[in-house]
């Protein structure tokens, strides 16, 4: 006989149908959290590939302000969202990410997003879905009622933090903390092309990175870049604290 899978007695699995079906039922009567609209103005927000899947829930209230946009005469509102991700094939755990974002376009790509907090549940044991749903409801409640003033201070700290004062200096700083030279250079140049804020700032590079992530056709690659951006943003917050 050929063994195709070998698992321990603690092995468990959160199937997409069970996970997202329960999420749907949990939020069915909660108007605070909704699915984003697609190009046809129809609620959407679900993605499923051969390796992973995700569901995006958005909150139209409790906004904070991106002053790099408002100072340039643009809409600087940032909204809150929950991004739930899973992999039935075991490529990753179940993740719940708290995010702030500028907008979701019709093909459900997040623009100007930063990751605020993450929950991770491995595919171990018999209560994976139960544990995840419990965390989602807790996180959604906390995210809805969290301190707007504190969140605004976080955004302000990231927008005011300078990485360096030259292009070469910024790229060098990014390489020191794990970015490749290509990604660092591309993020800098994308910020120059698309953002009103200086690419010398952490916020400028974060926005450059999140725009780069949208170039990828694969969810895992997009998320990897977005998480790099989140780590960079958190670093600026720690420096400012």
Predicted regions span which residues?
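Feature for intrinsically disordered/low-complexity regulatory segments and propeptides
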Residues: 1-24, 199
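Intrinsic disorder/low-complexity polar-acidic segments
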Residues: 21-240
């Amino acid at each position: 006989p050929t063994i195709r899978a070998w698992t321990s007695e603690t092995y468990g699995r959160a199937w997409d149908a069970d996970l997202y079906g329960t999420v749907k039922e949990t939020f069915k009567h909660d108007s605070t959290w909704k699915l984003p609209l697609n190009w046809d103005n129809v609620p959407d927000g679900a993605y499923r590939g051969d390796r992973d899947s995700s569901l995006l829930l958005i909150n139209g209230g409790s906004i904070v302000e991106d002053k790099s946009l408002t100072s340039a005469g643009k809409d600087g509102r940032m909204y809150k969202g929950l991004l739930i991700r899973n992999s039935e094939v075991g490529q990753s755990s179940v993740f719940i990410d708290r995010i702030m974002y500028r907008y979701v376009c019709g093909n459900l790509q997040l623009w100007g997003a930063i990751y605020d907090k993450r929950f991770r549940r491995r595919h171990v044991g018999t209560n994976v879905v139960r544990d995840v749903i419990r965390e989602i409801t807790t996180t959604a409640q906390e995210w809805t009622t969290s301190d707007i003033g504190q969140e605004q201070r976080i955004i302000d700290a990231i927008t005011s933090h300078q990485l360096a004062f030259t292009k070469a200096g910024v790229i060098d700083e990014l390489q020191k903390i794990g970015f490749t030279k290509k990604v660092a250079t591309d993020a800098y140049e994308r910020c120059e092309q698309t953002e009103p804020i200086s690419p010398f700032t952490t916020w400028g590079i974060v926005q450059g990175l999140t725009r780069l992530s949208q170039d990828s056709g694969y969810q895992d690659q997009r998320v990897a870049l977005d998480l790099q951006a989140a780590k960079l943003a958190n670093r600026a917050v720690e420096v400012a604290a």
